[in-house]
């Protein structure tokens, strides 16, 4: 029996690891799953845990008002050490590019515990866009022993960085596994305001740190202008809980009649709001991956993206945070049916709904079958104190 510990702290991580956790549980004859949450994002994380009926074995509950990235890193490093010592997992599994991912991987390295990185190999090639995610994932790739790349492009990025090809498995993205299950559900919104929307709906999400300040103001100016240009179109914005977002969005957008500002939605209603949308404006990485499966064109409110596959396929466009560009590209999609249909019809390059199965099979191949040994084994681990 081999023990696989899944460590995560935010809503996107939970969504993308949920299919893997469920798949691990289906292999309980050979793999024992242990779930650890840091609760880097408490409220938004808990809603996903409830949706997928995941009960953590350990909850570090590190979230605190106003804490910075250094605070999160230190808390994870200090608190997870005792969990690693108690459980002594054969593999620590992390997902993505959050501060939890980097800190949990570093702590595992200090304990000589192998690390598997789900969604490995994504690169924007700009260390400040997105911030801090680009550096988090690069550093995690240096630490990781197994790399689950969602696409061939991600695999190629890892190759160029010198990662051993035998440690890489191309899987597709687990977010599609979760999405396809949830999108098939019959659903009605609790809020009749959303149920009663007629006509075209533009869905907006924006929350990234690198956009705080002037870029965020530019995004909001574009939304206000578009709402006035298209009074028959409804613009729906689930506003992130971060004060840097809310303190800009509500004063600028709160009094426009066809802009609906709502609280962040739980995972299931948000997926169904995406289904209802005509166009999606977002800076979210996960939405860039999900939208093609729902046949929704995406305008990416960022300077660069580490997910170029959808842009290359033609289902997404990088529009940045410039007010004029956002207005121009959104107008194009609202008025040009041919262009809209072209973007909406691409095949999703990010997955087919079977990524979790590939991940667990590869883990079994590495751990159970021993066909490719992970270099550092349980009986060679050192007990080194964590230094931060």
List the predicted regions and their residue ranges.
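Nucleotide-activated sugar donor-binding and catalytic core shared by glycosyltransferases
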Residues: 1-237, 243-388
């Amino acid at each position: 029996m081999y023990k696989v510990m899944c460590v995560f702290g935010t809503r996107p991580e939970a969504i993308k690891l949920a299919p893997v956790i469920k798949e691990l549980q289906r292999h309980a004859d050979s793999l024992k799953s242990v779930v650890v949450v840091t609760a880097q994002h408490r409220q938004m994380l808990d809603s996903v845990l409830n949706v997928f009926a995941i009960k953590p074995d350990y909850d570090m509950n590190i979230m605190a008002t106003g804490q910075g990235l250094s605070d999160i890193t230190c808390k994870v490093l200090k608190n997870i050490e005792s969990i690693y010592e108690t459980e002594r997992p054969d593999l620590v599994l992390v997902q993505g590019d959050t501060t939890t991912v980097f800190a949990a991987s570093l702590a595992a390295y200090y304990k000589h515990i192998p690390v598997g990185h789900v969604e490995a190999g994504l690169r924007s090639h700009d260390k400040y866009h997105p911030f801090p995610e680009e550096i988090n994932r690069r550093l995690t790739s240096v630490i990781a022993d197994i790399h689950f790349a969602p696409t061939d492009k991600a695999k190629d990025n890892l190759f160029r960085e010198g990662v051993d090809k035998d440690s890489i498995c191309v899987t597709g993205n687990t977010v599609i596994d979760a999405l396809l299950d949830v999108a098939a559900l019959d659903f009605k919104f609790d809020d009749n305001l959303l149920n009663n929307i007629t006509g075209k709906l533009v869905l907006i999400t924006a929350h990234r740190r690198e956009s705080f300040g002037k870029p965020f103001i530019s995004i909001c100016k574009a939304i206000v202008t578009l709402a006035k240009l298209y009074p028959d179109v409804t613009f729906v914005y689930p506003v992130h809980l971060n004060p840097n977002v809310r303190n800009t969005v509500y004063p600028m957008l709160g009094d426009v009649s066809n802009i609906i500002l709502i609280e962040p939605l739980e995972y299931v209603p948000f997926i169904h709001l995406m289904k209802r949308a005509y166009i999606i404006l977002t800076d979210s990485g996960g939405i860039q991956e999900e939208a093609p499966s729902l046949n929704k064109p995406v305008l990416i409110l960022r300077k660069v993206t580490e997910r170029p596959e959808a842009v290359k396929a033609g289902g997404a466009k990088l529009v940045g945070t410039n007010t004029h560009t956002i207005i121009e590209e959104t107008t194009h999609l609202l008025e040009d049916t041919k262009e809209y249909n072209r973007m909406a019809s691409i095949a999703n390059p990010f997955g087919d709904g079977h990524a979790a199965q590939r991940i667990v099979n590869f883990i079994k191949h590495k751990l159970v079958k021993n066909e490719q040994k992970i270099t550092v084994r349980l009986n060679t681990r050192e007990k080194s104190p964590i230094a931060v």
